[in-house]
C-alpha cells in the first residue's frame, strides 16, 4: 500500500505535481475532480495550488451484456471517445452505441445538476486546468473528460492521479496530454489495491466537499 486513503494520496499527488510543474500555481489554476473519488483527491491538490475546486463528470459506455467492460465514454458536452479495438472485436453496432450514449448522457445531466448544486460552469479558457482522479486504469473515461475540457481552450491541461497504469499513461500521452502520477506500477492490477482505505465515496460527500470549496477563496 502506498496511500493511507484518498486524502493522503491527494497530498502526495500535490507534492509530485508541484515538483513536476513548479510554475503551475502562477497560471490561474483550477482543479476539476472526477467523481466520486477524484473530488477528494482534487480537494487536496486545490489546497496546495491555492486554486478553486470544481467537478467534471464522464460516464463509461458499457459493452452489450457486459456493462463493466468499457467500450468508450461520454462527457457532459457530448464529447465521446470509443475504444475502436474493443468495438470491432465485439461487433458492437452503431445503434447500440447511440442508445447507450443517450442513456449515459441523461445520467450525466442528472449528476452534473446534483453535484453543481446551482453553481455556474467555470470559464476554463486561458487557465491551467488540472483534472484529478483517484487512479488511472484504461484511461477511456479520462480521455472523454480531457477532450471535453480541451474544447474550452485552457492554457495548460494536466491529468493527475496518485496511481496510474502504464497503458493508461501511454494512451493519454499519445493524445498530447500531460500526465502526472505519484506511482506507475509495472504490475498494475487495479486502483484500489494501492490504498489502505479505498472506501466508496458517496454523492453526499462529493456535494459537501464541493460546497465547502465554493465558500473558499476564488
What role is predicted for each listed range?
Residues 1-218:
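PRPP-associated nucleotide enzymes
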Amino acid at each position: 500500500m502506498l496511500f493511507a486513503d484518498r486524502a493522503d494520496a491527494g497530498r502526495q499527488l500535490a507534492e509530485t505535481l508541484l515538483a513536476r510543474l513548479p510554475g503551475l500555481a502562477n497560471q490561474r489554476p483550477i482543479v476539476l475532480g472526477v467523481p466520486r473519488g477524484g473530488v477528494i483527491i482534487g480537494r487536496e491538490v486545490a489546497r496546495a495550488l491555492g486554486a478553486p475546486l470544481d467537478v467534471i463528470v464522464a460516464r463509461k459506455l458499457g459493452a452489450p451484456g457486459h456493462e463493466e467492460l468499457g467500450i468508450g465514454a461520454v462527457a457532459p458536452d457530448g464529447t465521446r471517445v470509443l475504444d475502436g479495438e474493443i468495438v470491432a472485436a465485439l461487433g458492437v453496432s452503431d445503434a447500440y452505441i447511440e442508445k447507450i450514449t443517450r442513456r449515459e448522457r441523461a445520467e450525466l445531466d442528472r449528476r452534473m445538476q446534483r453535484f453543481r448544486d446551482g453553481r455556474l460552469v467555470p470559464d476554463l479558457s486561458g487557465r491551467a486546468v488540472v483534472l484529478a482522479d483517484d487512479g488511472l486504469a484504461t484511461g477511456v473515461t479520462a480521455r472523454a473528460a480531457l477532450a471535453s475540457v480541451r474544447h474550452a481552450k485552457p492554457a495548460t491541461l494536466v491529468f493527475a492521479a496518485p496511481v496510474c497504469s502504464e497503458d493508461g499513461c501511454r494512451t493519454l500521452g499519445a493524445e498530447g496530454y500531460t500526465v502526472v502520477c505519484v506511482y506507475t506500477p509495472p504490475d498494475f492490477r487495479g486502483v484500489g489495491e494501492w490504498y489502505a482505505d479505498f472506501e466508496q465515496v458517496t454523492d453526499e460527500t462529493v456535494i459537501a466537499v464541493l460546497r465547502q470549496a465554493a465558500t473558499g477563496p476564488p
